[in-house]
């Protein structure tokens, strides 16, 4: 379903690589201190399709980017939504031809449509915010 975007579902055996990039993204955002346990809980659920999923670009061991999506509800409703928790692109792939972040956003849109859920996606950062705003 997502092959045309060059995005695939991440597998549980990729947990260490995904964690490294997710923690880097948390550190770069600098919004709050990251808890490795909380990040791992989110990542593990996504890797095992337990109320979430992780789309990645690249082969195992050569991750070029990823997006963590979780199924949750918004604070005022019992309706389920697909929520973006993080998009991460390793520094060596940022600004390089290939539109990785845009492809991951499109993956999120297609996943939400396939799941018949609204998509909650946006910007939470105090670092590189201008580039993220242009992305959306």
For each predicted feature, which ranges?
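Conserved beta-strand-loop-alpha-helix junction that forms the acyl-donor binding cleft
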Residues: 104, 108, 120-133
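Conserved acetyl-CoA binding element of GNAT-fold acetyltransferases
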Residues: 78-92
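Short amphipathic alpha-helix that is part of the acyltransferase structural core
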Residues: 1-37
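Conserved beta-strand in the GNAT
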Residues: 56, 62-72
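Alpha-helical elements of Rossmann-like donor-binding domains used by nucleotide-donor carbohydrate transfer enzymes
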Residues: 17-21, 42, 103, 107, ...
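A short helix-loop-beta-strand connector motif used in the catalytic cores of GNAT acetyltransferases and
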Residues: 43-56
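Conserved acetyl-CoA-binding loop-helix of GNAT-fold acetyltransferases
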Residues: 89, 95-110
């Amino acid at each position: 379903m997502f092959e045309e975007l060059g995005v695939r579902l991440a597998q549980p055996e990729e947990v260490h690589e995904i964690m490294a990039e997710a923690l880097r993204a948390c550190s770069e955002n600098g919004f709050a201190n990251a808890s490795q346990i909380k990040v791992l809980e989110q990542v593990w659920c996504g890797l095992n399709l337990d109320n979430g999923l992780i789309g990645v670009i690249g082969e195992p061991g050569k991750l070029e980017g990823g997006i963590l999506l979780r199924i949750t509800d918004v604070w005022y409703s019992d309706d389920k939504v697909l929520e973006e928790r993080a998009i991460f692109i390793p520094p060596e792939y940022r600004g390089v031809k290939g539109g990785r972040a845009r492809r991951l956003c499109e993956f999120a849109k297609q996943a939400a449509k396939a799941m018949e859920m609204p998509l909650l996606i946006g910007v939470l950062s105090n670092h590189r915010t201008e580039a993220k705003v242009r992305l959306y």
